[in-house]
Amino acid sequence: MKFPIYLDYAATCPADDRVAEKMMQYLTRDGIFGNPASRSHKFGWQAEEAVDIARNHIADLIGADSREIVFTSGATESDNLAIKGAAHFYQTKGKHIITCKTEHKAVLDTCRQLEREGFEVTYLAPKSDGLVDLDEFRAAIRPDTILASIMHVNNEIGVIQDIEAIGKICREHKVIFHVDATQSVGKLPINLAELPVDLMSMSGHKLYGPKGIGALYVRRKPRVRLEAIIHGGGHERGMRSGTLAVHQIVGMGEAYRICKEEMAEEMAHVTKLRDRLYNGLKDIEETYVNGSMEHRVGSNLNISFNFVEGESLMMALRDIAVSSGSACTSASLEPSYVLRALGLNDELAHSSIRFSLGRYTTEEEIDYTIDLVKSAVKKLRDLSPLWDMFKEGIDMSKIEWSAH
């Protein structure tokens, strides 16, 4: 067993060896290093063919047409292109957007920027299990609503939104529907030939591909139009200019190809280990799972350990790589905005740990993690006067703490 044990796959995944090997063939002069936009010689043709093959692999995994795949620098850019691109293109029809308070920052901050430009955004509060209330979503739609953005799987709590039902509501009201599928592609079956989704963001590195590459699915029928946010040579059908990073695209394509072949087996393995972890930790007193266990991706477990400070617990768990909150916000000492949106108090939000499992997680690592977490929580609670008071039956909420 190698230390520290990596249980932060929702932050990033190592590139699969097969992906890294494939990418190396597109970097040096012995390989295929051409610019796919060079149409007058073999170097360009070979590079273009490699990009086309990768585009097909990505489309195959999600049930799309390869012409609906636009390459970007990652899911953050895909979110920006989808939301800003659609908002700017359709703003003559209306300037109202709907999203959820638990979305990724790439969606929330993009919406905030649009608010500064004069758009109006409704931020829906999720139910306590993390799911969007469909009646509330329907009620939020106005005649001037042009776009809704709801993520498929949450990066912190792993809950799966019913994007089919939300998409149907959007179709009824002719609202464009964007889905951030960064955490669901390769973990859940997705068939865009059937799902009522217009725009979908994807990442390379969350599926054992390289960092710095992502894609945006843009529906052709019914056609969705976007205004570009990066201008230049008109690459990617004018939606995203810039020389295509062939080695990155090939890496992402290979990662998606592998996922299509191995997803069912891999998710069964990961879910079994996640359940083993959950069963090992659920009996610790004052332990709460954040988000629905029923509608949850198999790789995620987010637990709050009451009366334990999250940062102290992280330090006590030096042998395992986990996070409190998401990787994008885990450096801040603010409690997770996702958990606060579920209605958790600051104490519980602060004491949460996200375990995210992946392709290379083993049973041995999970058993070690269970033992380590149990002993760390016990040790920290033994040092906590709050835990003593709780055990004595004192109601914490009724105590008036004096300020010094």
UniProtKB/Swiss-Prot annotation:
Active site (UniProt): 328
Write down the EC number: 2.8.1.7
| Record keywords, A-Z | 2Fe-2S, Cytoplasm, Iron, Iron-sulfur, Metal-binding, Pyridoxal phosphate, Transferase
Query: For this chain's UniProt record, which GO biological process terms are given?
Result: [2Fe-2S] cluster assembly
Q: Which GO terms describe its cellular component?
A: L-cysteine desulfurase complex
- Positions contributing to pyridoxal 5'-phosphate binding: 75-76, 155, 183, 203-205, 243
- The record's top EC class is transferase
Pfam families listed in its UniProt record:
Aminotran_5 (PF00266)
Where is it located?
Answer: Cytoplasm
Cofactor dependence is on: pyridoxal 5'-phosphate
Pathway stated in the Swiss-Prot or TrEMBL entry: Cofactor biosynthesis; iron-sulfur cluster biosynthesis
The UniProt entry, under PROSITE patterns, shows: AA_TRANSFER_CLASS_5 (PS00595)
In the record, the note on similarity to other proteins reads: Belongs to the class-V pyridoxal-phosphate-dependent aminotransferase family. NifS/IscS subfamily.
* HAMAP family associated with the record: Cys_desulf_IscS (MF_00331)
What name does the UniProt record give this protein?
Cysteine desulfurase IscS
Q: Which organism's genome codes for this protein?
A: Mannheimia succiniciproducens (strain KCTC 0769BP / MBEL55E)
Gene designation per UniProt:
iscS
